Amino acid sequence: MRKMLLFCILLLFMPQFTVSESCLPSWFRQERSAPEQLQSAENAAENSGSVPPDTSRNSLETNEIGDAPSSTSTPETPTETTISEAGDDEKRTEEVAKELIEKEAEYEGEYEDEKVDEEVEEALKYNEDATQDATSTLKPAVRKEIEKLKEAKCKDYCHHNATCHVEVIFREDRVSAVVPSCHCPQGWEGTRCDRHYVQAFYAPINGRYNVRLSTMSSTAQLLVQQSSTSAIPAFAFLIVMLIMFITIVVYAYRRMSKRSDDMTYTMSHMCPPEAFNVLKTPNGRHIPVHQIPSCSYTIPTPGTVPPNISSTPGSRIPTRQQAIRNNEQARNNFFSILRSQGTIPSRSINDDDTPKHYKSVPRVEVSAINYSGHIDFSTVSYQSTESEVSKASVTCPPPAHTVINIELDSADTNFRSPSRSSGEQGSPATCEPMIRHT
């Protein structure tokens, strides 16, 4: 609401703050003021009864565009203020025009000076006359010395009709250095204009190159010619790269084959073929039994010698079910004894001891028996068999203490497991150890 009130107040006071039409030309303001004067004249005539003039009215109502009235022409009813304003405007425009003309003249003078300076610089670079003009401020003795140096330095220095000029460096009004330079004509380049100019290929032609080589030593010429014309380095590089590639391939192939051999050895080492015959013949070798009691063996006493094995009839082949049951019991007791004595390792395998490339191999945990020592079998029963007798089997009485020595090299007698289910006949001179069934 407060903003609306402020806006209304500004609208009321706006005509007082409006700026007069000072930016418009004087003749346009005079034409704008003419209708107001005409209206006031008509009102006065109506009141007095006289007829106003129609000249200005007709000129305004026709709406024709013509030339602007001149500043000298005065309206029919001019005022002193309009005449003074018109004079001031004319003075201002004249002053502005003069300023513009002066600035343009200054810019043209500066441009001409720059152009002259550029021409002088070019003349100093490429013109002998300009060089002489530049040295005109020097002493005559110095000028003569420069001319002598120029003749001495520029003689046979530039080729192919090139323009030669010297750059003289003064120190304490004395000539300290003279540097000749050549301005080459079209088609030549170089410090002495001795090379053909080839666009986008900045290399000397073969003839000039050979001429330049003549100034070198013999060894340098040979090296430059060999490096520019021979392809031996490129072929040598290709051969070296080929040898390196073949070496890398052979090394990788050997490494892969070695890894496969290690894996095969590890698999065979972890699961040897002899491990599957451990129950029948441990380690696949014959086991000699030093102390084997006879079938009619009784509990020995100290100082007595056990009798030999009797082959009397009365023993028979064990039945299939009894053999299988005895085999399972013997297997459990046999492995428990070996594991308790530290011969067979535990089933758990430490992953830290296994190589990394073996962890991904499927593992078969089969423990092979490699035992050389004494095994103490307590409560081991024996049974002798004979093919001719079909009576009930006679069980050997269990000895108080039986020691079996397992050796690797001897192969006197055969230790046969009661796992035979095919009904093979046993030897009458041997007794098979049996685990007592409870």
Swiss-Prot record:
Q: Report the record's Gene Ontology biological process terms.
A: egg-laying behavior; epidermal growth factor receptor signaling pathway; inductive cell-cell signaling; male genitalia development; nematode larval development; ovulation; positive regulation of ovulation; positive regulation of vulval development
The record's InterPro entries line, in alphabetical order, gives: EGF-like_dom (IPR000742)
Query: Which positions, given as ranges, span the membrane?
Result: 231-253
Upon gene disruption, the observed phenotype is: RNAi-mediated knockdown in combination with double mutants for the class A and B synMuv genes lin-36;lin-15A, lin-8;lin-15B, lin-15AB, lin-35;lin-8, lin-8;lin-36, lin-8;lin-9, lin-8;lin-37 or dpl-1;lin-15A results in suppression of the synthetic multivulva phenotype.
* Alphabetic keyword roster: Disulfide bond, EGF-like domain, Glycoprotein, Growth factor, Membrane, Signal, Transmembrane, Transmembrane helix
Q: Where is the composition biased (Polar residues)?
A: 36-62, 411-428
Q: Return the Low complexity bias intervals.
A: 69-85
User: Cytoplasmic topology: which positions?
Assistant: 254-438
**Localization per Swiss-Prot or TrEMBL:** Membrane
Tell me which parts of the chain lie in the Extracellular compartment. 14-230
The job of this chain, per UniProt, is described as:
Probable ligand for tyrosine kinase receptor let-23. Essential for vulval induction, where it acts downstream of the synthetic multivulva (synMuv) class genes. Probably by activating let-23, phospholipase plc-3 and inositol 1,4,5-trisphosphate receptor itr-1 signaling cascade, plays a role in ovulation by promoting gonadal sheath cell contractions and spermatheca dilatation during ovulation.
What name does this protein carry? Protein lin-3
> Which organism does this record belong to?
Caenorhabditis elegans
